[in-house]
């Protein structure tokens, strides 16, 4: 058995990690470039699409990731290792925004395990979680628990989950932000619930982010909430962009239209995601997956062109 000098092992390990990151990005770019049969790939170098957070100007990639159900795997060692590789792929392909919640079972603990194993590879991380309890003091404890589970000193974003006890929790989060213990404050809803109340909060409260449900078969938020976010300078995170997988059940039996090449789309996942993030009010979408191949498809939506308003109408 041949022993290698430790410096050579370290150099080789660093090279392999860098090669993996480069390879995954090239896979995404190749999927984009494949939609241009007459364009040489060597000349086609699309950039990762980013959008600014209106309150700060910080730019985020338009494709993030959620963890609902997919990271709720408890202490299963093999499942935890799998999720670590899913998260590694996300970062290797340029992802930053990772969203979770105490509501998601063991997801936050599993995320902490994955982030710890990845070390510097889990960077840059834009950490987003939520506070979800009807009691104000319990909410403060929950925030501290989430930081411990993730292994972080502070979060990039904390959000009041589904408007539960939103007045008190919003006070807590805004004070944390004022004290320098939190970068951004947000509020969330899902399934199209409580939109009127959410609209009033967006009108009256100094929030940085709003999170809501939006996909190609549910465009209700285009009427009032998305225009309001643009008007008020509020960043928008989109949850359930695949309608919990329902869009695949409906569309995947059909071939992807040839005209999707016009906005660099290679599969149905990218079709659904590019529709969502092409809306000018949307900052980021957070699809969830437990599979590396699906993560590669999802992240590919963050490269190349996006559909314009005319193409969006054709997609519907």
Where are these regions (language model features)?
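Alpha-helix-loop-beta-strand connector modules within alpha/beta enzyme cores
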Residues: 112-127
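Glycine-rich, proline-tolerant flexible connector loops at the mouths of alpha/beta enzymes
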Residues: 99-114
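N-terminal secretory signal peptides and thylakoid transit peptides that target proteins
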Residues: 10-31
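Glycine/proline-rich, positively charged
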Residues: 74, 133-220, 224, 230-237, ...
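Active-site mouth loops of central-metabolism enzymes
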Residues: 68-80, 130-136, 262
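Conserved, mostly hydrophobic/aromatic
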Residues: 53, 65, 98, 111, ...
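Structured C-terminal cap/extension of enzyme domains
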Residues: 30-34, 53, 224-316
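C-terminal segment of N-terminal export signals and the immediately downstream linker at the start
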Residues: 35-67, 72-77
């Amino acid at each position: 058995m041949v022993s290698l000098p430790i410096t050579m092992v370290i150099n080789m390990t660093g090279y392999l990690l860098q090669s993996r990151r480069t390879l995954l990005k090239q896979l995404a770019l190749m999927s984009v470039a494949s939609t241009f049969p007459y364009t040489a790939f060597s000349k086609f170098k699309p950039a990762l699409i980013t959008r600014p957070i209106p309150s700060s100007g910080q730019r985020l990639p338009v494709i993030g990731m959620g963890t609902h159900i997919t990271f709720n795997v408890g202490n299963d060692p093999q499942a935890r290792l799998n999720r670590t590789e899913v998260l590694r792929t996300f970062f290797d392909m340029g992802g930053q925004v990772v969203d979770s919640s105490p509501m998601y079972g063991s997801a936050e603990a599993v995320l902490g395990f994955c982030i710890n194993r990845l070390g510097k590879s889990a960077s840059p991380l834009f950490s987003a979680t939520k506070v979800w309890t009807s009691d104000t003091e319990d909410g403060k404890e929950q925030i501290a628990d989430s930081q411990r589970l993730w292994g972080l000193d502070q979060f990039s974003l904390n959000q009041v989950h589904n408007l539960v006890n939103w007045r008190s929790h919003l006070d807590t989060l805004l004070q944390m932000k004022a004290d320098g213990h939190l970068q951004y404050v947000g509020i969330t809803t899902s399934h199209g619930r409580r939109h009127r109340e959410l609209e009033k909060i967006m009108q009256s409260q100094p929030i940085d982010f709003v999170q809501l449900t939006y996909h190609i078969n549910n465009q209700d938020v285009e009427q009032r909430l998305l225009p309001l976010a643009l008007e008020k300078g509020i960043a928008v995170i989109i949850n359930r962009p695949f309608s919990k997988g329902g869009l695949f059940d409906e569309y995947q039996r059909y071939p992807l239209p040839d005209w999707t090449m016009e906005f660099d789309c290679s599969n149905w996942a990218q079709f659904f995601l590019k529709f969502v993030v092409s809306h000018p009010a949307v900052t980021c979408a957070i699809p969830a997956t437990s599979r590396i191949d699906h993560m590669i498809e999802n992240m590919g939506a963050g490269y190349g062109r996006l559909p314009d308003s005319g193409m969006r109408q054709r997609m519907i």
